[in-house]
Regions:
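Hydrophobic helical h-region of N-terminal Sec-dependent signal peptides
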Residues: 11-16
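Broad, structure-driven detector of short, well-ordered beta-strand segments within folded domains
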Residues: 104-106, 160-166, 261-279, 368-370, ...
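Hydrophobic lipid-interacting interfaces of membrane-associated proteins
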Residues: 49, 174-178, 213-217, 290-294, ...
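C-terminal motif of bacterial Sec signal peptides marking the signal peptidase cleavage site
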Residues: 19-23
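Bacterial N-terminal signal peptides that target proteins for export
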Residues: 2-10
């Protein structure tokens, strides 16, 4: 184990446990004045107090459980008896000196070739932090050698540099600080920086945010360094290496050019944000981009008119509102012969396929719906048999007429504008009825008396531009999927090369938890809510209880069992 690694592990464990043992408070409007909006390359945000409140983590720490956990935490202490201090710490996390009522956040400090991660937390009582550090030193048997300058205490643990004063604690992690700013400079900047305006993240429990142009600049700089090195190497390498090296150089130059062009529609401070929030009956992950300006507008929304053709027991349904003319215009503008050259493709073949796709999309205007109704395995073969459907709104018969022309001799005719073929007991049909183009696999295109249009998830996605829904309730009724899941995760004890392998207790617990966790889910959907935002939502069977609380309650009995075994 590297020097002071045990200290790092203990510190992280105790800080997290304390964070989940506290309550949260809301910042007043007046306190938000004179704060700095974080426009760093990367920003991380976590509201541990809110997470605890929603998940009920503090319910795990009853008096007896705190005593048990305190015994475990203090068991490695070789000096004074710290069990009572650990008890106080778990009962009142403010004893650590860190303010858990305010969110913690982090950002990237970028300087030349160096990128360092900075984590910031508010300090409530610096003297209590001193005592907390001493406690961790005693438990780990390692001294961190903290140095004090004025009201700043600072120490290093391997490549982790930590400092705190009377109001703020910062942790800086990076192995490459010697090539950019020194740890002292990064720490000084972090300690003296204005308070952060975190209002953009307050609606989330956890959030990650990236400045798109700054991130791309980092990627370009990295590739440019490799390019510079390759040119230097090209000047001295052997003749037989030159061809390969030139190919690599050309590839890097193309990648750099593509990266430079990738941000032309983004404003200078455009940011991409992923925020996760636990709510009653659901977990929501929202992905959004601010500062993106495109000449193409995503105005069309799904009508869901094809759901009446989809079985109520469908495993997966995907739907996208397509403006075919806009897609065709994008294909013609960006997928050019020059683009084919950049990708190293045959330009004539590329132009042919892009032209076919462009013409086909001109015929599409409206919903493009895909449904997988069932998956079965064939006995003895283990081959999946799929029952699926795809339906598309079209404005003319361009696509079906080309199918009949190019599919002659391959496809069988099943009537007017209906073609198909049978392969290994799989019947694939392609046809058109009025303004609907359809493709079925082991299915027939007709309305259902008990269709997916009546499913609960329909109301969640009805105003979207597109979505994908996995109906977990139906998935868990599918014998093939369930048996495949169990075969993958529930390995029995077995012999291999005369060795006996026994599934560990931890593996058994994990497998049991995994299945129970999935069983709590009703459905999962990914929805395009606006031209620049997407939501991934996990919807639980229990719609009243906070989703995080449901999972904490699920894990609770297992955690207590593990704690008891660790204490023995």
């Amino acid at each position: 184990m590297k020097k002071q690694t045990l200290f790092s592990i203990l510190a992280a464990a105790v800080v997290i446990i304390c964070g989940f043992a506290t309550s949260c408070s809301t910042e007043s409007e007046g306190a938000k004045a004179n704060k700095e909006v974080l426009n760093d390359t990367f920003v991380f945000y976590a509201n541990l107090g809110e997470i605890n409140k929603k998940g009920g983590f503090d319910e795990l720490l009853t008096e007896s459980n705190r005593r048990l956990l305190a015994t475990i935490i203090a068991s490695s202490s070789e000096g004074a008896d710290y069990e009572e201090y650990a008890m106080k710490l778990l009962a009142d996390p403010s004893e650590s000196g860190i303010n858990y009522d305010t969110p913690i956040y982090g950002y990237l400090n970028v300087k030349d070739d160096s990128v360092s991660l900075v984590i910031v937390a508010d300090v409530e009582n610096a003297k209590n932090v001193d005592k907390f550090i001493t406690f961790l030193e005693e438990m780990s048997g390692e001294s961190v050698g903290a140095v004090r300058k004025g009201d700043v205490r600072q120490f290093s643990i391997d490549d982790l540099h930590i400092a705190y004063n009377n109001s703020r604690l910062v942790a800086v992690a990076d192995e490459s600080l010697d090539y950019g700013d020194s740890p002292n400079k990064v720490i000084a900047k972090a300690l003296n920086r204005p308070d952060a305006d975190l209002s953009a993240y307050e609606k989330y429990d956890i959030a990650y945010s990236v400045n798109i142009k700054k991130l791309v600049d980092i990627l370009i700089a990295d590739k440019q360094r490799r390019l510079d090195y390759s040119y230097e190497y090209l000047a001295v390498c052997d003749e037989w290496e030159r061809e390969w090296e030139m190919e690599y150089i050309n590839s890097l130059e193309k990648e750099i050019e593509m990266l430079k062009n990738s941000t032309k529609d983004f404003e200078e401070n455009a940011r991409a944000t992923i925020g996760i929030t636990s709510k009653a009956g659901r977990i929501v992950a929202e992905m959004s981009v601010d500062g993106y300006n495109s000449e193409y507008k995503l105005d069309k929304k799904v009508s869901n008119e094809f759901l009446e053709y989809v079985n109520n027991n469908a495993l997966l349904v995907a739907n996208l509102a397509v403006d075919g003319n806009m897609v065709s215009e994008i294909l013609d503008k960006y997928f050019t012969a020059e683009y084919a050259k950049e990708l190293g493709l045959n330009r004539n073949e590329f132009n042919l396929y892009v032209g076919i796709a462009s013409d086909a999309f001109k015929s599409i205007n409206g919903d493009m719906t895909l449904a997988i109704n069932d998956i079965k395995n064939k006995p003895y073969y283990g081959i999946e048999q799929i029952n699926a459907l795809m339906a598309v709104n079209v404005t003319d018969d361009y696509i079906i007429s080309n199918v009949s022309m190019y599919g002659a001799g391959i496809l069988d005719s099943y009537g007017a504008n209906c073609y198909g073929f049978n392969y290994d007991d799989t019947l694939i049909m392609l046809g058109q009825k009025q303004d609907t183009l359809y493709l079925t696999v082991n299915n027939d295109f007709r309305t259902r008396s008990n269709s997916a249009a009546s499913k609960a998830w329909v109301k969640d996605v009805k105003n979207s531009h597109g979505y994908i829904v996995v109906d977990v309730d139906n998935v868990l009724k599918n014998d093939f999927i369930v048996s495949t899941f169990r075969e993958e995760f529930e390995k029995d004890d077995y012999y291999y090369d005369d060795y006996y392998y026994e599934e560990s207790k931890e593996d058994k617990i994990f497998n049991e938890l995994a299945y129970k966790a999935i069983d709590k889910i009703s459905y999962i959907y990914l929805s395009i809510t606006s031209p620049t935002s997407v939501e991934l939502v996990v919807v639980m069977d229990d719609k009243q209880t906070n989703a995080l609380k449901q999972y904490v309650d699920l894990v609770k009995p297992y955690m207590l069992t593990i704690l008891a075994s660790e204490a023995l």
